[in-house]
């Protein structure tokens, strides 16, 4: 909804992973104006525990969570921008980064710098800082083809300024995490050991050895 020099909005999403049969609902809110975007998102699982293809003897389900995002550009040099994101997810063993680093109620802060020399291309460099000194450094080059613009407009550096205005960004996608973050838990596996050969008289009792088995790939 437009309010003069700024825009507010609400959105809902249904995320579904065909390969794992996981579903998640997302609710978001945004506040945009010239050279500034602010977004907030809430993620809530719709499916429960399923066998995990990532870790042996583990189950997985979508993790509940939320994030806050802010992105801005310099009015005097709209090609240069910066992003700041805070994200928080809940669960005892959540793979916010990867399955080798499962964490309890993990959170992370992401900072990015972007440079758009012309509308067709954006170069980015960022750092995602999590708990326990865990971090990721990312570099990327993104190409965005807009069918409403001519090739000359998409390669014109002067056209970048219009992209940073409220009118120029009204068709942009909302900012959210489209990847479903998963929570894991270890299944209880019971092993019963039987002797290879049993000898005795009728009516005799023999003990069975029962133990918890811990086999398969484990998280680091």
Task: Name each model feature, range by range.
Residues 4-6, 34-40, 95, 148-152:
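Glycine-rich loops and low-complexity Gly/Arg-rich segments
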Residues 6, 21-23, 134-137:
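Short glycine/proline-enriched turns and hinge-like loops at secondary-structure junctions
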Residues 21-35:
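Contiguous hydrophobic, core-forming segments of folded domains
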